[in-house]
Amino acid sequence: MSVFKVERVDYLNEKDAQALVFLLDAYAQDPMGGGEALNPEASARLCQDLSRIAGAASFIAWSEGQPIGLINCFEGYSTFKAKPLLNVHDIAVLAQHRGQGVGQALLKAAEDHARQRGCCKLTLEVLSGNAPAMASYKRFGFAQYELDPAAGQAQFMQKWL
């Protein structure tokens, strides 16, 4: 088991920015991230853009000075609860560090941040074929979203613009 620490990302810090882009690119190239490298233009401006987004929060897991895991979150709002929520937009752990508690530690950092911000819940989406991630999220306390079992579970959809 690797020894690691989780720290909040300073988007304008060069070391943090490079680590975030490195980890996000590794995730993007993974089959569960789409299997393609990040667009170089997006990589170049990502952290500058994130620094301008109110409610953006990222955390990196570091082991021996090397980045090994990442979680990117964005604050949203629950109209039913009239409180903020925190959406986990990306979570990724380098393959050689999976199964060592890194993902759980990243989720804990996000939860702690959400509680400090007065959020009512954490949300995330996961591919149905990503069984290890689904098991990790369930272990952490996530469950399928539904308001009434008779109405079914929520489905995540998108439309490219």
Where are these predicted regions, by residue range?
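Conserved amphipathic alpha-helical interaction elements at protein-protein interfaces in regulatory
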Residues: 26, 30, 79, 99, ...
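C-terminal "cap" of GNAT-fold acetyltransferases
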Residues: 3-12, 22, 118-161
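Short coil/turn motifs at secondary-structure junctions
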Residues: 76-78, 96, 129-131
